[in-house]
Amino acid sequence: MENNTTIIEERIKFIRERIGYTQMEVAKTLGISRSLVSNWELGFVNISLKQLIKLAYLYQVPIDYLLGIIDEIDNYPYQFISNMDLKSIGLRIKEIRKINRLTQDKFAQKIDTKRSSISYYEIGKMMISTADLKQICETFGVSADYIVGNLKENIKRDKKIKLKIKDIKEKIVNN
């Protein structure tokens, strides 16, 4: 997996090929062009959260898997939502921020975004970007599927374990 793509692009292509879909079939199902699917897989265009959720539903995998938050999908307790509710997503983001006792400014700094974006996310005025969602999950050890409503309860992850696994994988690749 050594190229310019990130884990998101690698996984959306891997799952598509594994279940036997062509880029054209995915494009038709999602109502988009085949070239957009290709551009996602090549890492030329960032996939929006709305489209990522549609892909997760189509592929029947958790968003956490596509984002690289988890590596195993067996027995993962997610359910798919049919309609994204920006206010509910915002409330979950606010909950994560409050649990960590952070102001919107500090929260924004930790995930490398603007405070105004956090404010808009929390009040349901703006859909969270896929990059910000992934950063929240990695920084605070929370589930993307929980944030978007696919899980009723958050599955808290130990960030240190994730880092150790990453270190082990790198050592294996380098040896």
Q: What do these predicted ranges mean?
A:
Residues 50-65, 131-146:
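DNA major-groove recognition helix of helix-turn-helix/homeodomain DNA-binding modules
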Residues 17, 28, 57, 98, ...:
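Alpha-helical residues within the helix-turn-helix
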Residues 1-18, 75-99:
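A short, Lys/Arg-rich alpha-helix, primarily the initiator
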Residues 20-39, 101-119:
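Short alpha-helical DNA-recognition segment
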Residues 68-88, 92, 148-175:
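Short, charged recognition helix plus adjacent turn
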Residues 25, 36, 46, 62-65, ...:
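Residues in the helix-turn-helix
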